């Protein structure tokens, strides 16, 4: 008997929600394993105001009861990592989601800010503001092998874009947590816990070729008075910003394909 498609939910709290949805649709449907994707927004983010049509036309309000039936769930990044978690006005809804995921959903993937808020909620790890934004494409070092990294070798490339980092000393001090990979300069790439239910990835591995470039342009447009630095190790030639590299494509494909296979191997019995 043919199995039903994997049910995968995504809380999309990125600034570029339409592009993020398109990117995740692309990377999550690359394998031959059929998937049924459900994209959500946090309802309390729009409390007291009308949900913009650009959001409501592509995302559904977060439904906790529906979430509990998912085979896998992803929380995306969000450009709010400089805020304390309690300053995020929809944090209570996110924490309710995290509690539901921990109780009912066997496969959880947390990306960038999603990884930060989840690592803090589940393990009490603190978030620290970096002196400068980590922004560019960097080689990674594999410290501990993991099924999601299968097929990747040391120095695999991945894009990073964040103003904050989780407390590495706190992670090392918690025997439940493993740092599987970092940049070659020690910035976090992937953290896991022993049950392999939760994976925390601090890179925007879902970004397409233009993701970092678009992020730079968004920040410049929002704050033209700030002298933002362009992404490092990203453009083919200095002062030629029309031809960015996409040298993390194998990283992206490998990790998402491995995760989809992991979800298929550990389905939710609560459908």
Curated annotation (Swiss-Prot):
It catalyses: L-serine + acetyl-CoA = O-acetyl-L-serine + CoA. The active site is at 112 (acyl-thioester intermediate), 204 (proton acceptor), 206. GO terms for cellular component: cytoplasm. Pathway: Amino-acid biosynthesis; L-cysteine biosynthesis; L-cysteine from L-serine: step 1/2. Keywords: Acyltransferase, Amino-acid biosynthesis, Cysteine biosynthesis, Transferase. Disulfide bonds: none annotated. It is an enzyme of class 2 (transferase). It comes from the Bacteria. Its EC number is 2.3.1.30. GO terms for biological process: cysteine biosynthetic process from serine. InterPro entries: Class_I_gatase-like (IPR029062), MetA_family (IPR033752). GO terms for molecular function: serine O-acetyltransferase activity. Catalyzes the formation of O-acetylserine (OAS) from L-serine and acetyl-CoA. To a lesser extent, is also able to use succinyl-CoA and propionyl-CoA as acyl donors, but not butyryl-CoA. Does not acylate D-serine and L-homoserine. Belongs to the MetA family. Is able to complement an E.coli cysE mutant strain but not an E.coli metA mutant. This is Serine O-acetyltransferase. It comes from Lacticaseibacillus casei.
